[in-house]
Amino acid sequence: MWEVIIMKTYIGKIHLKWCKNCNVPLLGRVCEVCGSKAEEVKLTPPGDPRLGFQYDMDFINKILEEEFGAKNVLNGKIILLNKIPGNEEAYEIIVDGEVKYLIYFDEDKEKWKVKLKLNGAKDLMEKGAYKKIIKIKNDVVEFLKNRKGSVLRPGIVEFTDDIEEKDDVIIVDENDRVVGVGLAVVSSEDIKNMEKGKVVKVRFFIKDNEDYKPGKIYDNLEEAFDLMVRANEGVIDNYERNAIGFIKNTYEKIKKPVMVAFSGGKDSLVTLILTLKALGKDIDVVFIDTGLEFEETLKNVEDVERHYGIKIIRLRGENFWEKVKEYGIPARDYRWCSEICKLEPLKKFIEENYEDDVLSFVGIRKYESFNRATKKRIHRNTYIKKQINALPIFHWSSLHVWIYLLREKAPYNKLYEKGFDRIGCFMCPAMEMGEMNKIKREFPKLWEKWENVLREYAEKHNLGEGWIKKGLWRWKHKRQ
């Protein structure tokens, strides 16, 4: 069962706001299209939501349909996915300027599940939900209104026969109006045999004088994204101006050859664009091919070269598939792969091509992790002593990055349109189970190659199938 890990502090300022009139996310105080005042959006820390594409919309729609029977719930809306800390992969789904659903990957059931917010349930019923519904007496509604409590068996009029223990359910009154959502503590089969007792632990229930109106619907995402870009134009201009100023000032102070580390990801692409605008093309752009990259990433390197008329230097480390036989399975607490496949080829390149220090502009953002948030904006690489790292987009949120890329019509990696949060090695041990499940589904041959390595290792070291199936290989010290 998914549980949130409470964060005591945010990594930084939460930039996300919303224009309820245009129904688009905002980064400033006012919508630059209609002039409406931006409204706050409550998020779980660290609060760095990413933009949802059509794949994400279809994926979440499918989960909602499987759970509640409602179809195409999110169509015509901009959605954001806020990844939140927990013992399993989980996202808050932001629609119409509020969190309406929380989806999480249930590792025991190996499927995605949903936790409901009240307005999310209202949207589901509007779209024809017919599963996991409990109808209660109107006098019970009046009793539960404006207070927390539970739905008891005597107060239930009827219920659907598909409810399992620990399912989220929609609570409606005798007029089929959504009045609450909560967690079923028993199954439909149990309810049939009960005369009294608790059935639903209520999470949210209607209050007096509540008014709910769904947001504007767009014909397509392209139209919605275009308006979102225009609604944030001035904010993005300001962030671009500050980042370019940082790059120019840093270069003037340090006066060393310039390199941009390009990974095929969105953050490094923004950093490359800004550096080209600030300093021109007389820079080195370096891509490290670990041998574990997706084909889409390798293609993106070519697309970026062609789009900006530059040559990207490709570095290659030692063969991972040979080294894994020597070092064993890489893990979160045993990251030999980063050193051998990434850092060593870069270190060798810098040693051979620069007499002195090199100024490297890197797409690190503080919102990515607490570890990254502690970095100084200009610092020397502790592993590669000649590399001085500078971070132009350190204070940018994920939404700043996406709006900038859309405005620039930049050739971003198409993996993002397949629901990927990050771009990197396809079998990185830092992944969650939901991410691995997606790679297995989208890239079966690639994942099969890795599972064959895991299986061979497991047999050699007397590790059970659960070590692979439950993702225990991701920790070196969980192998026993």
UniProtKB/Swiss-Prot annotation:
GO terms, molecular function: oxidoreductase activity; RNA binding
Give the matching NCBIfam families.
PRK13795.1-2, unchar_dom_2
Entry's PROSITE patterns? PUA
Organism superkingdom: Archaea
What InterPro entries would the database entry show?
PAPS_reduct_dom (IPR002500), PUA (IPR002478), PUA-like_sf (IPR015947), PUA_sf (IPR036974), Rossmann-like_a/b/a_fold (IPR014729), Sulfate_adenylyltrnsfr_sub2 (IPR050128), Uncharacterised_CHP00451 (IPR004521)
State the family it belongs to: In the C-terminal section; belongs to the PAPS reductase family.
Record domain PUA: where: 131-207
Organism expressing this protein natively: Methanocaldococcus jannaschii (strain ATCC 43067 / DSM 2661 / JAL-1 / JCM 10045 / NBRC 100440) (Methanococcus jannaschii)
UniProt cross-references to Pfam families, sorted A to Z: PAPS_reduct, PUA
This protein's name: Uncharacterized protein MJ0066
Task: Print the keywords alphabetically.
Answer: Oxidoreductase
